[in-house]
């Protein structure tokens, strides 16, 4: 269910697209909804996108598309429907497509992607695999490589020498392979997830901590599935 402001913004975008074929600017949205700042509009846009009412299109200024209205009988068209199987993560992920940077301030505000926070990841003893997102965070596309991404909250101190601390939020690019030395989300025996540095030792896979207080764990290749590679980190002070 949408809030009053979310519904008003969705209707405004829909009507403007019908009239002109071009979505309204953030300033026009702000004025139409009588808000004081564009940051409020940004949050509303993110909420509508997360709920499947609008979609952002790559490589186009003001690239907003209305997918459905609240009273529509048809379900929203999923922008990306692939899932991990089997996996530590399920559901739609934040997708970043190759893009060219915008120079216009207004356009750059629309080049933000909603990244789902899928729970906690152990940087210590592996914890049970997590599959349900708790909320989303908005990140500029320029911060991320192309691909699908998700975020995890770090629990533990086994990666502190790599600059990854307890309570950090790590941004993971979804992929099922990685290079030697990459920091990855590894799913062990389809049950436990951990954040470690990947090392290949012959036919075995070593999951290496970045803290001398922890031991490297070695597994056969059939016991470890790569769920993604670390690409960014967020820390709150």
Curated annotation (Swiss-Prot):
Reactions listed under catalytic activity: Hydrolysis of Ala-|-Gly bond in repressor LexA
Entry-linked InterPro entries: LexA, LexA-like, LexA/Signal_pep-like_sf, LexA_DNA-bd_dom, LexA_repressor, Peptidase_S24_LexA, Peptidase_S24_S26A/B/C, WH-like_DNA-bd_sf
Annotated catalytic residues: 158, 196
Protein name per Swiss-Prot or TrEMBL: LexA repressor
Keywords: Autocatalytic cleavage, DNA damage, DNA repair, DNA replication, DNA-binding, Hydrolase, Repressor, SOS response, Transcription, Transcription regulation
Functional note: Represses a number of genes involved in the response to DNA damage (SOS response), including recA and lexA. In the presence of single-stranded DNA, RecA interacts with LexA causing an autocatalytic cleavage which disrupts the DNA-binding part of LexA, leading to derepression of the SOS regulon and eventually DNA repair.
Domain of life of the native organism: Bacteria
Family: Belongs to the peptidase S24 family.
Residues in the DNA-binding region annotation: 26-46
Pfam family, one: LexA_DNA_bind
Subunit structure: Homodimer.
Taxonomic lineage of the native organism: Bacteria, Pseudomonadati, Pseudomonadota, Alphaproteobacteria, Hyphomicrobiales
GO molecular-function terms, A-Z: DNA binding; serine-type endopeptidase activity
NCBIfam families given in the database record: lexA (TIGR00498)
One BP annotation, GO: DNA repair
């Amino acid at each position: 269910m949408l809030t009053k402001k979310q519904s008003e913004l969705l209707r405004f975008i829909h009507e403007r697209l019908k009239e002109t074929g071009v979505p309204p600017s953030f300033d026009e949205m702000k004025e139409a909804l009588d808000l004081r700042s564009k940051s409020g509009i940004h949050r509303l846009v993110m909420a509508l996108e997360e709920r499947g009412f609008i979609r952002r299109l790559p490589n186009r200024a003001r690239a907003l598309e209305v997918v459905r209205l609240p009273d529509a009988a048809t379900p929203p068209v999923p922008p990306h429907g692939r899932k991990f199987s089997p996996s530590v993560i399920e559901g739609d992920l934040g997708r970043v497509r190759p893009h060219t940077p915008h120079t216009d301030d207004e356009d750059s505000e629309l080049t933000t992607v909603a990244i789902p926070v899928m729970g906690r990841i152990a940087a210590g003893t592996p914890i049970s695999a997590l599959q349900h997102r708790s909320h989303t965070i908005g990140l500029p596309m320029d911060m991320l490589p192309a691909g699908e991404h998700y975020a995890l909250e770090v629990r533990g101190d086994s990666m502190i020498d790599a600059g990854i601390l307890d309570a950090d939020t790590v941004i993971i690019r979804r992929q099922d392979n990685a290079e030697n030395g990459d920091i990855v989300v590894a799913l062990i025996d389809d049950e436990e997830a951990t954040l470690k540095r990947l090392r290949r030792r012959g036919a075995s896979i070593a999951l290496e901590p970045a803290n001398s207080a922890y031991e490297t764990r070695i597994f056969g290749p059939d016991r470890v599935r790569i769920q993604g590679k670390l690409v960014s980190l967020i820390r709150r002070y």
